[in-house]
């Protein structure tokens, strides 16, 4: 009975697969939105202000960052929770090397980068945004920054504790051998 339950739980990991496919669909939507912005700007290029152009470019950068975040979550999540990808020759260098903690750190760093781009966009349009909203944008951004820094710090502490424990165990093993 126990083996059947464990097998069912193990097989249930495939239930997350449609969610990763959904993220692939979101990536397609982001690609369409990216090129919509690019095609929108082409006819306007000689008439748009410099700050308007910068705002469009910031929007494009925002889309690229979110797309990269989606790819990272899809690939590393699939490899960590479903199955290893058997891709010869075209495999990305970081695939298979990211554990859950490094994924969390990468995701939080990407969120901070996305928030930074959004905050820069808000600062470029301060005349359209109330001071109260700007303050809230800054508070939210700082919350992301502090959270990302805190998670990275905790991850570093955990890794140093693991390394310290590993060294202590190897010292004890070596003493017993003597």
Swiss-Prot record:
It is a multi-pass membrane protein. The chain crosses the membrane at residues 14-34, 53-73, 136-156. Belongs to the UPF0114 family. Its main location: membrane. InterPro entries: UPF0114, UPF0114_bac. PANTHER family: UPF0114 PROTEIN YQHA. It holds the Pfam family UPF0114. It comes from Buchnera aphidicola subsp. Tetraneura caerulescens. GO terms for cellular component: plasma membrane. The keyword Cell inner membrane does not apply. It is found in: Cell membrane. Keywords: Cell membrane, Membrane, Plasmid, Transmembrane, Transmembrane helix. This is UPF0114 protein in repA1-repA2 intergenic region.
């Amino acid at each position: 009975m126990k083996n059947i339950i464990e097998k069912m739980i193990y097989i249930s990991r495939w239930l997350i697969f449609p969610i990763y496919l959904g993220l692939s669909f979101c990536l397609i939507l982001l690609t369409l939105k990216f090129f919509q912005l690019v095609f929108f700007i082409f006819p306007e290029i000689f008439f748009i202000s410099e700050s308007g152009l910068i705002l469009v470019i910031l929007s494009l950068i925002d889309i690229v960052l979110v797309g990269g975040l989606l790819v990272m979550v899809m690939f590393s999540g699939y490899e960590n929770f479903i199955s290893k990808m058997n891709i010869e020759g075209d495999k990305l260098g970081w695939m298979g090397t990211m554990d859950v903690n490094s994924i969390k750190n990468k995701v939080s760093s990407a969120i901070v980068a996305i928030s930074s781009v959004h905050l820069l966009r808000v600062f470029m349009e301060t005349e359209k945004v109330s001071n109260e909203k700007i303050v809230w944008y800054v508070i939210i951004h700082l919350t992301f920054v502090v959270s990302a820094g805190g998670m990275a710090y905790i991850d570093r502490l955990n890794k140093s504790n693991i390394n310290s424990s590993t060294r202590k165990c190897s010292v004890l093993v070596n003493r017993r051998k003597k």
